[in-house]
Structure formats: structure tokens, C-alpha cells
Amino acid sequence: MVIQRNWQSLIKPEKLDVEPGNEPSRIATIVAEPLERGFGMTLGNAIRRILLSSLQGAAVTAVQIDGVLHEFSSVAGVREDVTDIVLNIKQLALRMHGEGPKRMMLTATGPGEVTAGQIQAGHDIEIMNPDLVLCTLDDGVKLGMEFTVNLGKGYVPASQNRQEDSPIGLIPIDAIYSPVRRVSYKVEPTRVGQVTDYDKLLLTVETNGAVTPEDSVALAARILQDQLQLFINFEEPQQVRHDEPQDDLPFNRNLLRKVDELELSVRSANCLKNDNIVYIGDLVQKSEQEMLRTPNFGRKSLNEIKEVLANMGLSLGMSVSGWPPENIEDLAKRLEEPF
């Protein structure tokens, strides 16, 4: 089946490394390799855009400050004006459990700085940057605030957070819901065996602490997977599991065939012979990396073998229990059949 061969002949990344930054819970570089040439750019750009636009997070959508009617006011004894206070509030990093909207309260008395850690958030909201300074009070000044917190994604301007029945003094705020602050990626060449034109994707992610970089990338990949599902308009071909018993064997009977029967090209056949691979059962337990380390064995030979194995419901990198059987030669003769 041509469709089957197209997607199964491509190499897939076999490892995902996480290189922590100076704040591991917020900053890390996710490294995926090996990828087919061009896939580093394709996946890196797609995941980056999803990370910045589509992850759900929590943000303050409105604030009410005692004695303040609108955001262009100033508060006696508070060094910052309301506009500056609102800008500081927008920097709050929150993790909310459950649905919104929810409320947070703040009561403070001067002198000194008022920080996010003084907010009474309740058990279902976590403040990830408690050291954030919201404003500075003079001696004896009292300040009270009430925050409205909601869940969302992306960026929502203050105009959309304004409710028609809002009480006087409730100031809507631009909501930056995304827990991801910065994303960058780069693609470097990597090698597998003797082949050097594969891609290595390095995705550097910085979050606000509400989600780890690794989890944010996992969520973005899941979103991408879900969006692409609609485009798959065929059923995946049924593959015979190698661990299903056939003819009282604990593995796929095709494993007992010799690789000479695969009708491979002379180059591929010689590479298998030089590597002492006699049966298909020996071959499928080799990984792609192991095969590519075989002298004179390149990507063309790898793809050829993967296509042939896929047509039998097999693949490289399989784990076969009970292999090799003690009477392998007798079994091979008894089950010998033409393809």
C-alpha cells in the first residue's frame, strides 16, 4: 500500500532531551532528534505558534480599588498612579484550579511596598511570582483591592472584559492568558550512523511558572495532533502483532523467514549478510540507528527495508520474546511459504 509506505518510511525522533535553563521550572530547551530534513523547521514553527497563542492560562480581567472610579485616577498616599498599578497587575502569573471567574482580595497598610504575595488568593489560585511589586504606600495609608480572575487563552483586550452591568469603579484589564512568555527555536544538522543530513530541533521555552516548559510543549503537540486528525481520511491498515501466536508460535511466523527472501537490492542484501543477519527475526530487533551504523548502509537501504517489513506488519526496533527458538531451522523449513 503506497500510503502506508509513505508515512512509515520516514524516520521518527527516538529521544527527547530537556536541557534546563537557569530557572528549570520556567526555562528549558527541548531537543528532539533525529528528524527528516525539513521537519525541524516545520514542527518548530508550528509548535512555537501554538505555544504563544493557544495554551490556556489564568489572568486578572478586572480590578476594583478602594476610592478609585477609573484607571486615570491617583490614590492619595500611593506613589504609583492607577495606570501604573494596572500595568503591574497585568504581570501577575497565576495558576487556577477549576473554572472561573474567581475573586482575590488584597488589604495593605503603609509604609512599604505591596507585593503579590500579600494577595489573599484562596485555595484554588496560586500566585507564581509573589515578589512582584504592585505599588508603594506611604506611612499610614491603607489600600484595598479586589481582583477578578478568569481562564482563557491568548490575549483579550480590556474592552472585551468590560461588562455592561459592571459596578462603578470596576476597571477592566487586558488579559494575557498565555502561560508561555517566550519561545524560540533553531534547527541544527545531526547524524545517524553514516547519514548526516537529518535535523535536530532545539525549542527554547520560557513560561511564567504556571506550567513547565516540557508540559507546555506536550500540550502544544497535543493541540496540533488534534487539529490534524481531521485531514486523515483513511483507516490505518491492520498490522499483525509480532507477539500474537501463530501456528503455536509466540511471535509472527514471518520472523522465521530468511532475509534472502525479501528480494532486497544487492547493496542492502550484502549489508545484512555482512552484519550476520540471517532471519527476519534478527533484523526486526535492530533499531534504525543500529542499521545506519552498518558499513555501506545508507538511508536508501533503510527505507527499502522498512517498506518491506511494513508490508508484513513488522518494523525495526521490535522486541521479540522467545527469539531465537531452539529449533529455528526446523520451524523455518516447516513454515516456509512463498510471499
From Swiss-Prot:
Annotated family: Belongs to the RNA polymerase alpha chain family.
GO cellular component terms listed in the entry, alphabetical order: cytoplasm; DNA-directed RNA polymerase complex
Sections of the chain in a coiled coil: none
Organism (species): Granulibacter bethesdensis (strain ATCC BAA-1260 / CGDNIH1)
Reactions catalysed, as given in the entry: RNA(n) + a ribonucleoside 5'-triphosphate = RNA(n+1) + diphosphate
Domain-related comment: The N-terminal domain is essential for RNAP assembly and basal transcription, whereas the C-terminal domain is involved in interaction with transcriptional regulators and with upstream promoter elements.
NCBIfam families according to UniProt: PRK05182.1-2, PRK05182.2-5, rpoA
Protein name: DNA-directed RNA polymerase subunit alpha
Molecular function per GO: DNA binding; DNA-directed RNA polymerase activity; protein dimerization activity
Subunit-structure text: Homodimer. The RNAP catalytic core consists of 2 alpha, 1 beta, 1 beta' and 1 omega subunit. When a sigma factor is associated with the core the holoenzyme is formed, which can initiate transcription.
One Pfam family hit: RNA_pol_L
Annotated region described as Alpha C-terminal domain (alpha-CTD), given as residue ranges: 251-339
Organism lineage: Bacteria, Pseudomonadati, Pseudomonadota, Alphaproteobacteria, Acetobacterales
InterPro entries from the UniProt entry: DNA-dir_RNA_pol_insert (IPR011262), DNA-dir_RNA_pol_RpoA/D/Rpb3 (IPR011263), DNA-dir_RpoA (IPR011773), RBP11-like (IPR036603), RNAP_asu_C (IPR011260), RNApol_insert_sf (IPR036643)
Region Alpha N-terminal domain (alpha-NTD), residue ranges: 1-235
EC number annotated for this UniProt entry: 2.7.7.6
One annotated GO biological process: DNA-templated transcription
Enzyme class: transferase
Disulphide linkage map: none
Biological role stated in the UniProt entry: DNA-dependent RNA polymerase catalyzes the transcription of DNA into RNA using the four ribonucleoside triphosphates as substrates.
Keyword annotations of the record: DNA-directed RNA polymerase, Nucleotidyltransferase, Transcription, Transferase
Gene transcribed to yield this protein: rpoA
